[in-house]
């Protein structure tokens, strides 16, 4: 019929399907754009080179795990079994690693105070505003002296007053700055406690002594699930789970770090981190700012069939970590790669970053890109003020110019092999020499006689020697025991492992110490000498881990925390090497100093504030509640002001009242007046 039009009616399912098809098509078109393919291709090239360069390091790390677990390499097992005999493995490496871990944890974690501190930055010169304030204080001080003495101070006195005013002002500023630094320290300690610093650092120490390098990542802002408490309408306390954003820290598995080939430090080139993510973790990124929701949904639909990871290394690592049959777990995992490095501005603009963030398309920008398979799920700039990556790295022994260093398993690898060989030979020799070797003349043994079993009081049936020889039919030969020589070899090379690793046996409780170690003072000297080796490792931790991580957390607080009372210029001090000194000795010296200064002369010099500062350090060393034992500087100052006001008020109340006087200036009548008058005239009352 002419002029009629038809309206097509579709249901909600059809509309949803059409929208999904349109969204998938748009995503495919965007991901297939040359720039996106270029970004993925660039990352793939970087990844392939980094993965290839790390293969020797991966084999070294797998060997270190086997060495700690007491397992031979596959080729060594074949050689031993071809020869026959014992497959015993002496756990020298494991003992040294555990001793080193315990020693480092005792130095860095078990001191009652963090292995770092914050101090206010020294002020070399005053700003113009502060100089004006000093001049004003100086003028007031001079005016007061003129009013008191009726004359101006001499030029030398003026210069001395000016210097004193400047020093007092600088001291006041430093005290205020140190108060801010102390508040910042408390804030960072709380953030470390909430962000998992201690647990991460504990795992980091295990990596440090085992692998060629160890890593810590942070601060990384994540959503934290915490418990809160509130009072309901009935006055009862109820629990409430809340989500808050906060900085977190984590130990990064060295197997999952892939640096750019040829670099020495993390900041020298790009870096990949491998994130195995379950479907739930990946889906939780939907809606998070910076992530591409459509790309994530597409990856979830496709699955993890486009992984770039070498599964052989993953399987071997899982077996060494006792994660048997991990490949059979029903939970699907996606291999996400986090890239930190330079990316061209053109790629970032085409991805979706604004021109305000990327003003020049021709420049290279520090970026953070996440890729799963062939899909980029995140591409943002690195917003660190210095463009640094959120990683820190160090090694047990560092090699100049190399990214990867050495761990204890690598250091004593040869010595572990010799100890194993000596132990295998010892066990084999003990087995052979434990009984006699039996020689039997079969021509003189009856056919039904069992010659494979020996027992006490066994009777052997034999025949005469056909040739008339007088030699016995059965002869016993006792093999020699070489246990003494083999034990000497083992002990020699195990002692060499002490020297090479820097972890002597007496550090972890071996009482069989010869020479100077037999006395307490001699053992103390040996412990001090052994500490020189571990001190170098502690210095690496101080400079490469503790100081940069604390500094990054400080910068984060300066940028994002709203509390202005904690903000100020500070210097981060790492104290791990200082903590290596004997803590008891340091505290004893502090107590001796307190006793030596407990006299009026020294108290006038150091004052109550100085003595309180020493008491605080002594209380910290004794792991006492410092704030409950010694008042803080603020509280002590407040108490001093209150006491001063109370003393002034008491003196004012005790001051004698003015005596009433007559017009001629004499006291008014009465007994007291007469007494005063008589005293004035010199006569007795």
Regions found by a protein language model. Give the residues of each.
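Extended, helix-rich architectural segments
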Residues: 1-366, 485, 491-492, 681-685
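Conserved structured core elements
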Residues: 178, 182, 198, 406-409, ...
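Generic, well-ordered alpha-helical scaffold segments in large soluble proteins
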Residues: 187, 191-194, 219, 415-429, ...
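Short, glycine/acidic-rich hinge or "gate" loops at secondary-structure transitions
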Residues: 199-207, 225-226, 435-441, 505-520, ...
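Extended amphipathic alpha-helical segments with heptad-repeat/coiled-coil character used for oligomerization
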Residues: 217-220, 231, 518-617
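Extended, charged amphipathic alpha-helical segments
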Residues: 326-328, 337-517
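Long, highly charged low-complexity segments enriched in Glu/Asp and Lys/Arg with interspersed Ser/Thr
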Residues: 607-650
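Long, low-complexity, intrinsically disordered segments
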Residues: 661-685
């Amino acid at each position: 019929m002419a002029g009629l039009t038809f309206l097509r009616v579709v249901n909600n399912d059809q509309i949803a399907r059409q929208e999904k098809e349109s969204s998938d098509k748009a995503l495919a078109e965007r991901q297939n754009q040359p720039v996106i393919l270029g970004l993925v291709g660039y990352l793939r090239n970087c990844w392939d080179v980094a993965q290839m360069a790390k293969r020797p390091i991966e084999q070294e790390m797998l060997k270190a795990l086997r060495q700690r677990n007491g397992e031979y390499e596959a080729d060594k097992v074949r050689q031993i079994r071809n020869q026959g005999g014992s497959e015993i493995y002496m756990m020298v490496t494991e003992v040294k690693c555990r001793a080193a871990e315990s020693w480092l944890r005792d130095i860095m974690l078990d001191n009652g105070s963090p292995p770092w501190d914050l101090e206010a930055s020294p002020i070399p010169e005053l700003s113009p505003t502060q100089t004006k304030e000093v001049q004003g204080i100086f003028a007031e001080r001079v005016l007061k002296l003129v009013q008191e003495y009726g004359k101006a101070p001499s030029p030398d006195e003026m210069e001395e007053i000016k210097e004193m005013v400047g020093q007092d002002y600088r001291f006041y500023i430093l005290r205020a700055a140190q108060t801010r630094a102390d508040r910042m320290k408390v804030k960072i300690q709380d953030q470390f406690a909430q962000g998992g610093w201690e647990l991460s650092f504990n795992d980091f120490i295990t990596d440090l002594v085992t692998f060629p390098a160890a890593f810590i990542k942070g601060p990384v802002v994540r959503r934290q699930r915490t418990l809160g408490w509130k009072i309901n309408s009935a006055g009862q306390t109820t629990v409430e789970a809340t989500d808050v954003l906060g900085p977190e820290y984590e130990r990064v598995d060295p197997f999952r770090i892939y640096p750019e080939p040829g670099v020495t430090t993390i900041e020298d080139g790009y870096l990949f981190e491998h994130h195995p993510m379950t479907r739930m973790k990946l889906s939780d990124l939907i809606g998070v700012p910076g992530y591409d929701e459509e790309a994530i949904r597409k990856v979830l639909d496709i699955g993890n069939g486009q992984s770039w990871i070498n599964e052989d290394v993953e399987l071997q690592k899982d077996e060494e970590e006792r994660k048997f049959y991990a490949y059979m777990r029903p939970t699907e995992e996606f291999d996400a790669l986090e890239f930190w490095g330079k990316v061209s501005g053109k790629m970032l603009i085409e991805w979706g970053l604004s021109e305000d963030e990327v003003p020049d398309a021709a420049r290279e920008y520090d970026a953070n890109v996440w890729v799963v398979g062939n899909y980029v799920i995140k591409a943002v700039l690195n917003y660190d003020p210095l463009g640094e990556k959120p990683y820190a790295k160090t090694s047990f022994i560092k090699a100049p110019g190399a990214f990867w260093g050495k761990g204890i398993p690598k250091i004593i690898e040869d010595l572990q092999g010799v100890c194993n060989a000596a132990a295998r030979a010892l066990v084999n020799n003990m087995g052979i020499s434990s009984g006699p070797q039996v020689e039997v003349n079969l021509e003189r043994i009856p056919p039904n006689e069992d010659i494979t079993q020996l027992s006490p009081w066994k009777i052997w049936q034999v025949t005469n020697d056909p040739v008339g020889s007088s030699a016995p039919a059965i002869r016993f030969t006792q093999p020699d025991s070489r246990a003494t020589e083999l034990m000497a070899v083992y002990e020699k090379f195990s002692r060499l492992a002490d020297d090479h690793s820097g972890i002597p046996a007496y550090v972890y409780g071996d009482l069989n110490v010869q020479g100077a170690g037999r006395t307490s003072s001699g053992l103390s000297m040996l412990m001090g000498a052994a500490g020189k080796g571990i001190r170098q490792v502690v210095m690496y931790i101080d400079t490469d881990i503790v100081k940069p991580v604390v500094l990054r957390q400080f910068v984060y607080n300066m940028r994002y925390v709203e509390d202005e009372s904690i903000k100020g210029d500070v210097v981060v001090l790492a104290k791990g090497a200082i903590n290596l000194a004997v803590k008891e000795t340091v505290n004893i010296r502090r107590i001796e100093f307190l006793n030596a200064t407990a006299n009026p002369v020294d108290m006038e010099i150091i004052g109550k504030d100085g003595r309180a500062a020493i008491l605080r350090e002594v209380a910290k060393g004794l792991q006492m509640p410092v704030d409950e034992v010694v008042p803080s500087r603020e509280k002590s100052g407040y108490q001093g002001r209150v006491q001063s006001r109370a003393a002034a008020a008491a003196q004012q109340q005790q001051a004698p009242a003015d005596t009433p006087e007559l017009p001629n200036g004499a006291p008014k009548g009465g007994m007291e007046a007469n007494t005063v008058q008589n005293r004035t005239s010199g006569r007795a009352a």
